[in-house]
UniProtKB/Swiss-Prot annotation:
GO terms for biological process: UMP salvage; uracil salvage. Catalyzes the conversion of uracil and 5-phospho-alpha-D-ribose 1-diphosphate (PRPP) to UMP and diphosphate. Pathway: Pyrimidine metabolism; UMP biosynthesis via salvage pathway; UMP from uracil: step 1/1. The keyword Magnesium applies. Disulfide bonds: none annotated. Uracil binds at I194, G199, D200, A201. Binds 1 Mg(2+) ion per subunit. The magnesium is bound as Mg-PRPP. It comes from Francisella tularensis subsp. mediasiatica (strain FSC147). InterPro entries: PRibTrfase_dom, PRTase-like, Upp_B, UPRTase/APRTase, Ura_phspho_trans. HAMAP family: Upp_B. This is Uracil phosphoribosyltransferase.
Amino acid sequence: MKVVEISHPMVKHKLGLMRAASISTQEFRRLTKEITSLLTYEVTAGFELEKIEILGWQGENIEIDQIKGKKLTVVPILRAGLGMMDGVFEHVPAAKVSMVGMYRDEKTAKPVAYFAKLCDKLDERVALIVDPMLATGGSMIATVSLLKKAGSKDIKIITLVSAPEGIDALAKAHPDVELYTASIDSHLNDKKYIIPGLGDAGDKIFGTK
């Protein structure tokens, strides 16, 4: 599995601010959007271009470069992934949106999809999953499996922080996906929180406890 930890100083600086215990909802939300925007720029760097012909400003036909294929679909994992969508839209404002909701079954401890609204022609699009944290990897693995079952063939993932345990699990389950993250953190604690991590990103984005 391709794993890219973005080392850009602006990404590291902004992520450092997000780790503060005293951070406000407004600041956490803003930084989530800004880092997602920077990561989206990195993800799209490898997109294939094609030449198309348009009518230029001089009234003559000219060739320009455009990204090849259908517009990507951004796939936020509910609910925290919603806070990352605007960062993607800054670079891909015409992106389609496919939403996936997961909950953990108390008996099996496995993620179960409770909601999925996917766009059409997934087999012709890049699917960009966004979720602030990759902890155990359970929800991410289930989301990738759901997308593949629906026809998706090109799946990329953006997270703000990732645990080594989650990366390993994802790589074993889906070695063909690509992961772009602002940080590979140290480990998971006994409560399955990423250390040093960000705390509960969903609560911090939406101002809940």
